[in-house]
């Protein structure tokens, strides 16, 4: 809760500010197209001719990176912007474009991906469709249900995603047939990174050097953990030459020092996966002529209070409803959000979401919250001001939060303050990343999620995965996420309907039902919606923003110039 004060102290360290630079908000996401957008400029068509290449560009990030090799989540997200090329990218209008591969489909069931001309691995070997197939098979062998169903130790079955595939004679195209049509399949490919078959095949382990063979415009030159730097240089095998010769990622332990470095010109931009500049820093940065801000309409959910619907206090829907009316959303929006922040709907997903429905706004209503507490059996308050049931037990729960995410801790503290003032006791469980994952994720808990409630931030990519609308975080059967532990048949039936959609109109119908379900049952709460505010040095021009990876995207390095 000290973030506002800390951010304001940065003012004393700034040089005298003149004015803020900004950009107009991007439009909302459009429905995905089965073909590449014809009227949207590609990065190649849009890139200017720079007066001279940029020798070195430094990106600040607070991402925790330990090994800098393929398979480390935070590194993979970072490297997706430089070396680990996804199949496609999504622009800020919500439209998809080829990156590593072009794509096509006739029926939303069989999707064909064709490797772009001239694409090679950094060791000189060509990228082929067999690399895509190998990656899917490798993931299958490591727990993903790509071509065969997977059964967990507890008997939970994840059905296979694909029913089959074909590869073209020239090995450059693969056609993947889904178990059921998915008009939104491209959203899953914005973060799908391909592995080199010739490196990994037949090996249980690979060396760090082998793990760093990639197919993007850059290759990893060095990782200095002590200095906190990750350096990428141009991949000479890439078919096009970017404007930036070298990209250095500077790892920071906290946001305060990172933003100060941006103001002082020590770094050129800041980046966090699917997250913009926190509202507590935006006023400070907006007043600095050395910093430019760009506002991007976002499809993520930056601040989520998720309930465990299967264990603990919040198996009782009345208590989830009570919390939904007891919270002060205007306080979250004002304190943590930007000037574009909004109070969310009870339907959870923001208006940029494909299939969005305008459900009722979340409101603060103590009398309604009190009615729901009484319906749950908590009719009186004790001497400490907390609701108690007939057995004299206080309404209390433990709220789990990742200690490494300062803003998330701020959300948790504000929830505790507000709910305890209302009459629900909140015990904060502030833990490290590993302990947090073990309590909040099916994958890392081995299908034994123990949190009663937790603070999450859902990425735009995650919100769109599976059936979309954040459903992977709600579905208790999801192999990786499933934090809300919802196994309700009504919910499952809606997911089946969405999965079976053969047209975008069919999908919209199912999406509307899912938002109505969220609004009626409150398995989770969005504390506020917001655009993403991205920050970079005012010395840069012609920056390109990606809907998934923000400023840290491959196309940016081909467009960005120095003023």
Regions found by a protein language model. Give the residues of each.
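Gly/Pro-rich hinge or "lid" segments in bacterial periplasmic/extracellular proteins
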Residues: 93, 189-242, 246, 366-367, ...
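Extracellular/periplasmic solute-recognition and catalytic clefts
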Residues: 139, 145-147, 166, 221-233, ...
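Detector for C-terminal structural segments
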Residues: 326-356, 407-416, 441-563
């Amino acid at each position: 809760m000290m973030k506002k004060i800390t951010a304001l102290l940065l003012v004393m360290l700034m040089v005298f500010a003149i004015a803020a630079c900004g950009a107009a908000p991007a439009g909302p996401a459009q429905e995905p197209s089965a073909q590449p957008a014809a009227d949207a400029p590609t990065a190649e068509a849009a890139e200017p001719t720079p007066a001279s290449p940029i020798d070195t560009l430094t990106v600040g990030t607070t991402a925790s990176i330990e090994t800098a090799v393929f398979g480390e989540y935070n590194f993979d997200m970072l490297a997706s912007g430089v070396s680990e090329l996804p199949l496609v990218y999504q622009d800020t209008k919500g439209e998809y474009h080829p990156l590593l591969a072009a794509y096509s489909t006739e029926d939303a069931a069989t999707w064909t991906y064709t490797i772009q001309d001239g694409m090679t691995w950094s060791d000189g070997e060509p990228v082929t469709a067999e690399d895509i197939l190998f990656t899917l098979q490798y993931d299958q062998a490591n727990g993903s249900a790509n071509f065969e169903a997977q059964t967990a130790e507890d008997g939970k079955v994840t059905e296979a995603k694909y029913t089959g595939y074909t590869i073209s004679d020239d090995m450059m195209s693969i056609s993947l047939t889904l178990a059921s049509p998915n008009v939104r399949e491209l959203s899953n490919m914005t973060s799908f990174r391909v592995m080199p078959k010739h490196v990994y095949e037949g090996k249980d382990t690979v060396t760090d050097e082998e793990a760093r063979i990639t197919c993007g415009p850059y290759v990893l030159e060095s990782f200095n953990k002590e200095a906190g730097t990750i350096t990428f240089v141009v991949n000479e095998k890439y078919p096009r030459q970017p404007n930036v010769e070298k990209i250095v990622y500077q790892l920071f332990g906290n946001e305060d020092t990172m933003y100060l470095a941006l103001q002082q010109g020590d770094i050129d931009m800041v980046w966090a996966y699917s997250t913009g500049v926190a509202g507590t820093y935006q006023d400070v940065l907006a007043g600095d002529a050395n910093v430019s801000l760009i506002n991007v309409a976002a499809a993520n959910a930056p601040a989520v209070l998720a309930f465990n619907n299967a264990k603990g206090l919040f198996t009782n829907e009345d208590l989830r409803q009570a919390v939904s009316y007891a919270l002060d959303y205007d306080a979250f929006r004002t304190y943590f959000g930007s000037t574009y922040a909004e109070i969310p709907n009870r339907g959870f997903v923001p208006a940029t979401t494909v299939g969005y429905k305008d459900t009722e706004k979340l409101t603060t209503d103590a009398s309604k919250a009190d009615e729901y507490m009484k319906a749950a059996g908590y009719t009186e308050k004790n001497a400490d001001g907390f609701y108690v049931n007939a057995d004299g037990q206080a309404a209390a729960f433990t709220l789990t939060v990742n200690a490494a995410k300062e803003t998330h801790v701020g959300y948790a503290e504000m929830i505790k303050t507000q709910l305890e003032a209302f009459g629900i006791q909140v015990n904060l469980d502030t833990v490290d990343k590993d302990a947090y994952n073990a309590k909040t994720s099916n994958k890392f808990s081995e299908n034994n999620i123990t949190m009663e409630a937790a603070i999450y931030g859902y990425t735009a990519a995650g919100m769109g995965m599976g059936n979309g609308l954040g459903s992977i975080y709600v579905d208790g059967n999801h192999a990786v996420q499933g934090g809300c532990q919802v196994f309700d048949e009504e919910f499952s039936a809606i997911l089946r309907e969405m999965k079976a959609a053969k047209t975008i109109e069919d999908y919209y119908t199912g999406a509307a039902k899912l938002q109505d379900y969220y609004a009626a049952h409150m398995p989770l709460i969005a504390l506020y919606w917001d655009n993403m505010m991205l920050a970079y040095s005012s010395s840069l021009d012609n920056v390109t923003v990606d809907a998934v990876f923000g400023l840290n995207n491959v196309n940016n390095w081909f467009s960005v110039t120095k003023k």
